[in-house]
Amino acid sequence: MALHHLRHAPLALRLARLPRLAPSPPPPAARLLLLLAPSQHPAPPWRLLSRPRALATAAAEADDAGAGGNGDGDGFFSEESTSWESLGVSDRLASALHGAGLARPSLVQAACIPHVLTTNDVIVAAETGSGKTHGYLVPLIEKLCSKSISAEDGNSQDVTSGSPNIALVLCPNVMLCEQVVRMANSLVDESGEPLKSAAAVCGPKGWPTVRPDILVATPAALLNYLFDYDPEKRRRERFLRNVKFIVFDEADMLLCGSFENQVIRLIHMLRFDEKLLSRMEDSGKEISLGDTNEYREDSDSQSAELSADDEENEDGLVQHRPVNVENAHIGAHKKDWRRVRKVYRRSKQYVFVAATLPQSGKKTAGGVLKRMFPNAVWVSGAYLHRHNPRLERRWIEVTADTQVSALLDAVKYGLKNEVHDTKLGPNRTMVFTNTVDAANSVSDILQRVGVPCILYHRDSSLEERAKNLQSFRENGGVLVCTDAAARGLDVPNVSHVIQAEFAACAVDFLHRVGRTARAGQSGIVTSLYTEANRDLVRAVRQAEELAQPVEKAFSRKRSFRNKLKKQALHKSTALLS
């Protein structure tokens, strides 16, 4: 369904028979000015999400209590007897969580926090909206609070020196980095200061002048910093040594496409530092990167020059290539202790978090993690890759003549009072398309019938996207977007998701529908599809009814397509011969 062709269609004829939708009331003028005008004294970043999140949590707790409050079935929260303190969280941090509107851990948080509090590597694969971000932030902050700063220069403001305890969180894009920073800084003490400070290094943001406890970065930005002019590698060495906890948020994206080589390379560097530290402790001698000839500086420096565009690119510009984890950064001409010694004393913890983590095949993200971290603890959500029972599904087959009216009817349906819980604030509807052109076309259609909407796609500037996303969070309305808004972004209380064009793959489908029914709430997903998608939709619905992974439906479609292609090729070959 190529919606961008609608720009050249006689819209007036199609829309003449449709009732004009009443526009949403505009926000108060004072509030609008506050959103659009640059502030000289911006409010603390944690206040942006505190109110919507508190509303969402309260509503979910009420629903959970009405269902028995035992955490069973389709409940979001853990059992009533499970508290933050019972998971190993200190009273101080538990108080900060209560202050942020998080009175009780979710099922996923209750499952993963005790494991992350240990020294084990952990892989958290759980459905969207299950509380994964706080699932790793809470134990990281707990560890950082409990660790005493023993280094002599612990009061230094240089991010590469001082405390030997830094948590590193890697995210695929700028918006997700800033979101994680907001969520970390929302956990404050009695004075209103964050328990542990977090800062982002991504996009236009340079390296922080004041050392944070939690550094959130895109792989490209981090590599560019580590490989700046540093002849003795001291900056890189100090940073790698100080990082004790590493989180890979949206791990499935970070381990494929344009991010794969960058992330694997960072893992090599961190593991190499672990081996150096292990050898130093065994020998009792100081060993640095500058003392190891096997660490190949030149090739690393050349491949470290990455553009800022890489942070926003998800289309796989860097080709896949096999990587030997154990032998990274080792000269091919030497076989020293690092090449033959596979057992070494661990000094870092790795945590991988994802809402979609396919494991079928060695090249999938799940397959890569199984090989690289065979001893990691896996924590899986109850509805990973499966239908969320809190979702109301609506499936509508459309043609070129009915797709516009079906889209407008879907938008109208989500605006009904009986569909949207007004206690959760303004109505929020997300309309997904497959391309930027289609998003622009849908926006034009909605504007022509009097429905204000906000655009969010990759052709918009980073500043425009940030402003539009904040407006959507604060004021609600209709957000017309591509899959750039499908992953990672936490917008509380989205009541309705509309697929104006059906998703092309299982990952996109799961992330789209995961924008609603988050944090224990209910939600609606309306999927418009054409005859070309009919078999795929039938397979998806069957998988949901049988509580099977949705990804298999898309795999069957791909296998069927490949089979048809092979048959067509054989026929062409036979005709030519």
Swiss-Prot record:
Motif (Q motif): 82-110
EC top class named in words: hydrolase
Binding site for ATP: A126, E127, T128, G129, S130, G131, K132, T133
GO cellular component labels: chloroplast
Residue ranges of the motif DEAD box: 249-252
Reaction it catalyzes: ATP + H2O = ADP + phosphate + H(+)
GO function terms (MF aspect): ATP binding; ATP hydrolysis activity; mRNA binding; RNA helicase activity
Region annotation (Disordered) ranges: 288-317
Family annotation (InterPro entries): DEAD/DEAH_box_helicase_dom, Helicase_ATP-bd, Helicase_C-like, P-loop_NTPase
Every Helicase ATP-binding domain range: 113-375
Keyword tags: ATP-binding, Helicase, Hydrolase, Nucleotide-binding, RNA-binding
Enzyme Commission identifier(s): 3.6.4.13
rRNA processing recorded as keyword: no
UniProt domain Helicase C-terminal: residue ranges: 407-568
Family listed: Belongs to the DEAD box helicase family.
Free-text domain note: The Q motif is unique to and characteristic of the DEAD box family of RNA helicases and controls ATP binding and hydrolysis.
Protein name: DEAD-box ATP-dependent RNA helicase 22
